[in-house]
């Protein structure tokens, strides 16, 4: 199988290389593409050195089976036809096509079969905060239909990119040295602070990040449930966390949901309050699953449950989810059979 990665030098592109190798993804030839800045850079994959090629409007994608793209929405829109015109399936990590009615938005644990209907040859990877949430919500939806969702996210600096993570390190150093901190990648100093804004504000007072969770959840889960989100940037490095309040049609017990999490795909139960055992970002970098803890009844709503999630947003929230989509296609799509 011929596989391509567009945006190979970025944080998610590098995660693609690790995940493809970890999971022994079937690759006969791997092609790496990037911008003028990264073209010529060499990376080693399974003992072979591969040079990043300049992404151009040509026939470089002829014969490619699957192309993972993570180079920003503008690049994805600009190069979508170039990538797919010879039959490659484009699995895109940007926001460019997520709400396009002709592009499925897929989290394999929830709606893998949607990936079969792709008139444009494109499958969209959802936003990282949405991915981790719907993996857990699907386990609850399987017990009783979810009517309403409230979520507060606590998102790591790396969600804003490698340069943002470097800025957080530098801010901590500067503050501890008594220097004025550099503020470029965030609206305010993030070190020793939290910022209740991710992306720009929309006319309804919610940010674009918060509205992504509203719209994407409906599309992925095929649900009428509304999702009200509050997205906050916190001074951790990697792994996002979420506090969720979900209302179901019938009351669901704590034990019912715990059992569903134990048996759910892509989920790991970590919930022992007596031992102070619950998911935390510090300990979950590089983990595949969405970790669930602090499960309890919502004391304000007899049909409500409250729980806490942590997941590596660069892994499951980006590269891993895309690779899992590709794995599902290889096993289930006639295009890849034989």
Regions picked out by a protein language model, each given a short descriptive name:
Residues 1-190, 226, 259, 290-291, ...:
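N-terminal Rossmann-like NAD(P) cofactor-binding subdomain of oxidoreductases
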Residues 67, 157-338:
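Charged docking surfaces used in two-component/phosphorelay signaling
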């Amino acid at each position: 199988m011929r596989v391509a990665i567009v945006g190979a030098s970025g944080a998610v592109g590098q995660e693609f290389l690790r995940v493809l190798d970890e999971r022994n993804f079937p690759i006969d030839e791997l092609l790496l593409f990037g911008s003028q800045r990264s073209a010529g850079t060499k990376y080693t994959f399974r003992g072979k050195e591969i040079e990043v090629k300049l992404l151009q409007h040509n026939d470089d994608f002829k014969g490619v089976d699957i192309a993972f793209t993570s180079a920003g929405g503008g690049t994805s829109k600009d190069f979508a036809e170039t990538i797919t015109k010879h039959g490659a399936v484009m699995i895109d990590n940007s926001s460019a096509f997520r709400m396009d009615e002709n592009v499925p938005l897929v989290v394999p644990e929830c709606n893998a079969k949607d990936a079969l209907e792709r008139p444009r040859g494109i499958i969209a990877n959802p936003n990282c905060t949405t991915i981790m949430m719907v993996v857990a919500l699907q386990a609850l939806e399987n017990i009783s239909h979810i009517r309403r969702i409230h979520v507060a996210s606590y998102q790591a600096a790396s969600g804003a990119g490698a340069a943002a993570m470097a800025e957080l390190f530098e801010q901590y150093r500067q503050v501890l040295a008594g220097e004025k901190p550099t503020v470029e990648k965030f609206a305010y100093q993030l070190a020793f602070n939290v910022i209740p804004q991710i992306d720009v504000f929309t006319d309804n007072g919610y940010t674009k990040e918060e509205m992504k969770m509203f719209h994407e959840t409906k599309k992925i889960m095929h649900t009428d449930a509304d999702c009200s989100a509050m997205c906050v940037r916190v001074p951790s490095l990697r792994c996002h966390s979420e506090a969720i309040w979900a209302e179901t049609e019938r009351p669901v017990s704590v034990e019912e949901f715990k059992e569903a999490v134990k048996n759910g795909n892509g989920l790991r139960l970590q919930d022992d309050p007596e031992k102070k055992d619950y998911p935390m970002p510090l300990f979950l970098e590089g983990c595949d699953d969405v970790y669930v803890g602090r499960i309890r009844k919502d004391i304000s709503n007899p049909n409500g449950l409250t729980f806490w999630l942590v997941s590596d947003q660069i892994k499951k929230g980006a590269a891993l989810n895309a690779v899992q989509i590709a794995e599902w296609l290889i096993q289930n799509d006639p295009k890849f059979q034989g």
